[in-house]
């Protein structure tokens, strides 16, 4: 039986996240780790988006394992897993990510280091793309595509015109498991975390 995936997009203001990254990158913190941590913390509040399904059953993992897409030099793709990313501190997460990427590119990862993700993150922001949709990997219920953060002219709630840095994120989800309201609520809460309280990610 074929299933239908669907897409939901959201625009997130990243000024506070970018400021936090500039503050912490000298300590080895990566933007990928920051994004993975933000996603994982939000997933812990939205277990439906961390779930997966088949034609006969749904699976609700006890852990939040964020798989992050990494391009290989031979043109392939692998998804190293940041296990329990909602519980691991940001600095350990950054060190773990650096180690996973290094071993992924030398093809030294163990199967459970790339096959146990419960949610996938694909970040093409470093390539400057405005937006993209990611293909849902087997075994997970959703994947989040993250585009570049750019200066954008916006209107404030008070009607003033200002410039803020914003990025577009797009969620691809399995409709057998996740409904549109689940996806929208997850993206809303992710945006609120990144926009209003990114410093909590470093605690």
Residue ranges: model-predicted function:
Residues 1-203:
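C-terminal catalytic/motor cores of large multi-domain enzyme assemblies
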